[in-house]
Amino acid sequence: MDGRHVVELRGVPVDELAPYLTARSGLPGPRGNLELADEFASIADRATILRFVALDDEYLRFCGTEAIGRLIVEEPDDASLSALVRRRAADDLWRVREAAARALQIVGDVDRARLRPIVAEWVGDANPYVRRAAVAAICEPRLLTDPATRAAALQACCRASESITTLPATERKTPGVRNLRQALGYCWSVAVVADPDEGMAAFERLRAVDDPDIRWIVASNLKKTRLRRQLASRWTSTAYRLNQDD
């Protein structure tokens, strides 16, 4: 969002925010206005955020859900906020579920140490949509800048992948599990590239698992350019060392 629009949003009266956002939401359409939602998250007051989270309107609910991430940072002792985002991570609307992951990323942008235990808790949730939000939130390159968060991302990928292997075949076909599998189809590559040594070891262990969904996850990640480059670099380095040993 450019500066002009930022200033414009800040100047909108609270009682006019809903129609303002809805008119510029990009919905219905293939892509909602994420930049506008980010700006709302950065400036909205608590009451407006909590009001929007409860609305039926998809975009306003999206905006409110994402903005709770800032409230979690500002009010770390209020456990009800992370619980609310957790409920939205299992929302019927896919955009709202995505907003829950974005809310956690807002937390991570400010406080990685606050993000990590939330992800660790969510990835053990019985609802696959919540597990998906946890993995998608932490497997974001801009957040994987310190050893503890990189390790947390790999651990989240491992636990979420393992959770699929314990399910019967009929349950694996549900939309939530399919959504989780799809996320793991790219999140592993992000986590591995962020921490190549530990990541490649974990990914090799994953490749050894004899499970159809795990094989799909592995194959999907191997198609990602970021991981293919990492593998090429690793193989080149290994070949060089072998030649030197000769």
Residue spans for each PLM region:
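Short inter-helical turns and helix N-cap capping residues of alpha-solenoid HEAT/ARM repeat scaffolds
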Residues: G29, D56-D57, D92-L93, A126-N127, ...
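Alpha-solenoid repeat junctions
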Residues: F40, A44, I68-V73, L104-D111, ...
